[in-house]
UniProtKB/Swiss-Prot annotation:
Domain ADF-H: residue ranges: 5-139
One Pfam match: Cofilin_ADF
Name used for this protein in its record: Actin-depolymerizing factor 2
Gene Ontology cellular component terms for the protein in this record: actin cytoskeleton
Lineage: Eukaryota, Viridiplantae, Streptophyta, Embryophyta, Tracheophyta
SUPFAM superfamilies cross-referenced by the UniProt entry: Actin depolymerizing proteins (SSF55753)
Functional summary from the UniProt entry: Actin-depolymerizing protein. Severs actin filaments (F-actin) and binds to actin monomers.
Family listed: Belongs to the actin-binding proteins ADF family.
GO biological process assignments: actin filament depolymerization
GO molecular function: actin binding
Keywords of this entry: Actin-binding
Length: 143
């Protein structure tokens, strides 16, 4: 088990599932949560490759923080298909202050455990992580 700087442990499954997403494209997305009592980051939800962006956003609670990884497919201006792995720090305004602080203090260390993140987004509401934001940050147009 890896250890985040805030004293948060990172469950081995977090890294294993990320490697499967990155290398084998087994998942479209992964949502992670911090189990405060166990002081550990764990996998909360795995999105199948066929699941959509809407399925992903529906998995993020409106009033609780989460970390997420999303494998975003897009077309470049030269008409080449590409993908980018996004790391999303979801911290809605309505989340508890303590939760926001725990997620913020653990984020960088947790992100370092996931080798291969290409783009990072921080969002406090859904408009900050819309498909248009993903497209512009990835440098292409959506597939």
């Amino acid at each position: 088990m890896a250890n985040a700087a805030s004293g948060m442990a990172v469950h081995d499954d977090c890294k294993l599932k990320f490697l499967e997403l990155k290398a084998k494209r087994t998942y479209r997305f992964i949502i992670y949560k911090i189990e405060e009592k166990q002081k550990e980051v764990v996998v909360e939800k795995l999105g199948e490759p066929t699941e959509s962006y809407e399925d992903f956003t529906a998995g993020l609670p409106a009033d609780e923080c989460r970390y997420a990884v999303y494998d975003f497919d897009f077309m470049t201006k030269e008409n080449h298909q590409k993908s980018r792995i996004f790391f999303i720090a979801w911290s809605p305004d309505t989340a508890r202050v303590r939760s926001k602080m725990i997620y913020a203090s653990s984020k960088d260390r947790f992100k370092r455990e996931l080798d291969g993140i290409q783009v990072e987004l921080q969002a406090t509401d859904p408009t900050e992580m819309g498909l248009d934001v993903f497209r512009s940050r990835a440098g292409g147009i959506e597939c």
